[in-house]
Amino acid sequence: MTQEKGKFAEQLALNYLKENGLALVMQNYHCRLGEIDLIMREGSYLVFVEVRSRSNMNFGGGLASITYEKKQKIIKATSHYMIKYRIQDKFPIRFDVISIDGKSNKITWLKNAFDAGC
């Protein structure tokens, strides 16, 4: 996915999540361990969101495109974020995936798509 398409997909996802009652905490959190596209708040939960845009759905949707290694990077970046901001054990967390069909811009929201145990 090109950087321009990625930013467009993230903005679509962000707007969709806000329309569904989530609040933005941070966008594009980067650390040496990995990155997190969106960090949102839903009730008491901190929700760490991976955004995937697929122009060809023949090989599965967004979740199918997230490898074990990518999940590990997201989990490590989440730990880094929680420690950096001293909020570990203060909020329950969840890992969601927003999958966007690159042709139609149809959004699929997979709540609790994976956990820290992968």
Swiss-Prot record:
The UniProt entry, under Pfam families, shows: UPF0102 (PF02021)
Q: Give the matching InterPro entries.
A: Restrct_endonuc-II-like, tRNA_endonuc-like_dom_sf, UPF0102_YraN-like
The family classification in the record reads:
Belongs to the UPF0102 family.
| HAMAP family recorded | UPF0102
Give this protein's Gene Ontology molecular function annotations: nucleic acid binding
Q: What is this protein called?
A: UPF0102 protein lpg2994
What Gene3D superfamilies does the record point to? 3.40.1350.10
